Amino acid sequence: MVSRKAVAALLVVHVAAMLASQTEAFVPIFTYGELQRMQEKERNKGQKKSLSVWQRSGEEGPVDPAEPIREEENEMIKLTAPLEIGMRMNSRQLEKYPATLEGLLSEMLPQHAAK
């Protein structure tokens, strides 16, 4: 037999999941401080990369980071699977944004018909 505490915990988790699926509010994944730290890491990574480009150029002096290096010229990113973007909306959301949805559909339908 299952204990009452386990049933109560599962019930609380279920109710929280139902509320989370019905809410339209934005819940931030990262705090503001975490975002700042991640942006700082990205800036530092970019500075390190530009330094390594300069070191690879040898005695030629600083290289413009916008110029591709011979090794990087031949690199190409290829998608291995088709990419599809979609969204789910419940009936309340559909009733709330009819004009926007009509505009999006009118833009997308001619594009698909042309293909």
From Swiss-Prot:
Which keywords appear in this protein's UniProt record, sorted alphabetically? Cleavage on pair of basic residues, Hormone, Secreted, Signal
Query: Where do the record's region annotations for Disordered lie?
Result: 39-72
| GO MF entry, a single one | motilin receptor binding
Read off the InterPro entries from this record.
Motilin_assoc (IPR006737), Motilin_ghrelin (IPR006738), Promotilin (IPR015662)
Kindly indicate where the leader peptide sits in this chain. 1-25
Q: Where in the cell is it found?
A: Secreted
Task: One GO cellular component term, please give it.
Answer: extracellular region
- The answer on whether this UniProt entry bears the keyword Signal reads yes
Family membership: Belongs to the motilin family.
Function of the protein: Plays an important role in the regulation of interdigestive gastrointestinal motility and indirectly causes rhythmic contraction of duodenal and colonic smooth muscle.
The entry's protein name is: Promotilin
Q: What is the lineage of its organism?
A: Eukaryota, Metazoa, Chordata, Craniata, Vertebrata
- Gene (UniProt): MLN
